């Protein structure tokens, strides 16, 4: 079985190709939109994805050394995400499905992150931290779905950091040589400022931290502000995670999503693992950010259980939560 996956939920347009035997991942091509200034504008994302989609598709097929006729199923991320960006991927997936008579597999973007985590870390029954620009979720699989134990009450951890570095003119670009610019800035700081720390049960709030940090710009060293924002945000996350570990008694902690690439977070999680006698499983950097391979792999799992969608019903779902998705392949 060969499955082609299309990812276009935010700033990255990606196409991945997988098969149902090792090595599972045959191709993982992508192109990421980097704004010259400001944040991501939906219209700019649409234009970028539309311009690069054909090239990325061709590169993926060439990398996998197969033709479109060899593909069994087309998997596509229908949400959550930014509407115009989602539509580019959905439109391409529908066109391929219709032209080549292929079945269409609907994939939740977050489930893609989680499933590629299972594959690459070999986790079996973990508590999961899903950390990205748009999501901050503590979850685990239970009775047919991924159940959310904790999440952000406002903006996501990754988004908070992106907005902060953009507002203080450190970005774009947000990532330099694989390192987020807040980490680069924070490594030069050492003073922990008094900024909001908000954890409610296993939920977190990052908006107050962002607002307060921006208010002290010009009054404190920027390096110390970066250091404080990073340390406080990560410590909030770790407190909520410890509570979830105590509740679930899990012996594995799997971290997926773009923020999983943070070296400083990795160090904190390794210490947490030692304290709680928990194995830390972190998705490799290649699969931490948005990518088509994770959509293809999750799509292959779904297709194996007959999860398909008619082309005329393949609507995008910008607010599609991971706990709304039935997971028959894990029952």
UniProtKB/Swiss-Prot annotation:
GO molecular-function terms, A-Z? iron ion binding; N(6)-L-threonylcarbamoyladenine synthase activity
Q: What cofactor does this chain's UniProt record say it requires?
A: Fe(2+)
> Tell me, what's a Pfam family for it?
TsaD
Q: Does DNA damage show up as a keyword for this record?
A: no
Superkingdom field: Archaea
Q: Which InterPro entries does this UniProt record tie to the protein?
A: ATPase_NBD, Gcp-like_dom, KAE1/TsaD, Kae1_archaea_euk
Q: How is the cofactor bound?
A: Binds 1 Fe(2+) ion per subunit.
Q: What class of enzyme is it?
A: transferase
Ordered alphabetically, the record's keywords are: Acyltransferase, Cytoplasm, Iron, Metal-binding, Transferase, tRNA processing
**Residues at which substrate binds:** 130-134, 162, 183, 262
| Cellular component GO terms, alphabetical | cytoplasm; EKC/KEOPS complex
What is the E.C. number? 2.3.1.234
Q: Which organism is it from?
A: Saccharolobus solfataricus (strain ATCC 35092 / DSM 1617 / JCM 11322 / P2) (Sulfolobus solfataricus)
Give the matching PANTHER family.
TRNA N6-ADENOSINE THREONYLCARBAMOYLTRANSFERASE (PTHR11735:SF14)
Family assignment?
A: Belongs to the KAE1 / TsaD family.
The record's Gene Ontology biological-process terms are: tRNA threonylcarbamoyladenosine modification
Chief localization class? cytoplasm
Described by its record, this protein's role is as follows: Required for the formation of a threonylcarbamoyl group on adenosine at position 37 (t(6)A37) in tRNAs that read codons beginning with adenine. Is probably involved in the transfer of the threonylcarbamoyl moiety of threonylcarbamoyl-AMP (TC-AMP) to the N6 group of A37.
Localization of this protein: Cytoplasm
Q: Spell out the protein name for this chain.
A: tRNA N6-adenosine threonylcarbamoyltransferase
- Catalytic activity as recorded in UniProt: L-threonylcarbamoyladenylate + adenosine(37) in tRNA = N(6)-L-threonylcarbamoyladenosine(37) in tRNA + AMP + H(+)
């Amino acid at each position: 079985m060969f499955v082609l996956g299309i990812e276009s939920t935010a700033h990255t347009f990606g196409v991945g190709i997988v098969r149902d035997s090792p090595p599972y991942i045959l191709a993982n091509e992508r192109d990421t939109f980097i704004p010259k200034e400001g944040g991501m504008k939906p219209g700019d994302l649409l234009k970028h994805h539309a311009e690069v989609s054909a090239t990325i598709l061709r590169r993926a097929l060439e990398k996998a050394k197969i033709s479109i006729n060899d593909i069994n199923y087309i998997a596509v991320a229908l949400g959550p995400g930014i509407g115009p960006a989602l539509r580019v991927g959905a439109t391409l997936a529908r066109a391929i499905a219709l032209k080549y008579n292929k079945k269409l597999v609907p994939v939740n973007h977050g489930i893609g992150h989680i499933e590629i985590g299972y594959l690459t870390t070999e986790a079996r029954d973990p508590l999961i931290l899903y950390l990205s620009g748009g999501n901050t979720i503590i979850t685990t699989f239970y009775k047919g779905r991924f159940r959310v134990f904790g999440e952000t009450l406002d903006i996501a951890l990754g988004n908070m950091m992106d907005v902060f570095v953009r507002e203080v003119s450190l970005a774009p670009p947000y990532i330099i040589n694989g390192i987020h610019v807040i980490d680069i800035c924070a490594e030069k700081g050492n003073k922990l400022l008094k900024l909001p720390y908000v954890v409610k049960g296993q939920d977190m709030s990052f908006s107050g931290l962002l607002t307060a940090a921006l208010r002290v710009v010009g009054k404190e060293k920027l390096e110390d502000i970066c250091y404080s924002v990073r340390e406080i945000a990560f410590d909030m996350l770790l407190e909520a995670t410890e509570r979830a570990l105590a509740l679930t008694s899990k012996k594995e902690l799997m971290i997926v999503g773009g923020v999983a690439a943070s070296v400083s977070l990795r160090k904190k999680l390794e210490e947490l693992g030692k304290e709680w006698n928990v194995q830390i499983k972190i998705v490799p950097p290649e699969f931490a950010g948005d990518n088509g391979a994770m959509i293809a792999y999750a799509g292959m799992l779904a297709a194996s259980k007959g999860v398909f969608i008619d082309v005329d019903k393949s609507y995008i779902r910008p607010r599609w939560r991971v706990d709304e998705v039935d997971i028959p392949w894990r029952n």
